[in-house]
Amino acid sequence: ASYWGFTITDGALRMLVLLHFHKLGYSPVQIAFLFLLYEFCGILTNLFGGWIGSRVGLKATLFAGLSIQAVSLVMLSFLNPEWAVALSVGYVMASQALSGIAKDLTKMSSKSAVKLLVPAEDDASKSERLLFKLVATLTGSKNALKGVGFFLGAVLLSWLGFSPALWSMAGGLLVILLVCLIYLKGDIGKSKAVSYTHLRAHETSI
């Protein structure tokens, strides 16, 4: 559910940025630059996300993804239309970099958690079919919900305006984060490796 909520806000954010800066008169190339670090930081997060998740747990990376996205939305809401174009582009690129990190942390956490939470069955093929169905549902719903997000972003921009729309989405993410904090227990996906200092203490006692 947290991944679905995040996906909607992520799609809405893309549409908000695209429409708002087109309205301000930015060129297609300038608008394209706004999303450059979003994609680049997403690639970097994909490279190291699994390693981070195994060290701190998937719950921590999920919470980090939701929190970073909320920070990105609030940061973007403080953009001043009076700033120079170069400063505005750099500022938005920085906020989109955070959003790219948040997107892949949340995606990695959600998909990995599904694999870990599938109950073990005596029939291995039954577990595999259930896992395939859940992952396919999660992945397939992404495009549909992103489309909902595009529409939501356009509606919020025309109804509330740029900054209030961003604040409302940040508030929605904080509600999702609060629900996850209450109901998600345990260290999902955290490596169970025993630390070196613990091993040394055990050897000494022997």
Q: Could you say what each language-model-derived stretch is?
A:
Residues S95-G140:
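Cytoplasmic helix-loop-helix junction between adjacent transmembrane helices
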Residues T197-T204:
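Conserved small/polar residues in nucleotide/adenosyl-binding loops
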Residues T45-G57:
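Helix-to-loop junctions at the C-terminal end of transmembrane segments
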Residues E39-I43, L47, K146-G147:
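Residue-level signature of mid-helix packing/kink "hotspots" within the transmembrane helices
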Residues A1-F40:
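Helix-loop boundary and gating motifs at the non-cytosolic
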Residues A165-L181:
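Symmetry-related core transmembrane helices of the 12-TM Major Facilitator Superfamily/SLC fold
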Residues S67-V85:
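C-terminal ends and interior cores of transmembrane alpha-helices
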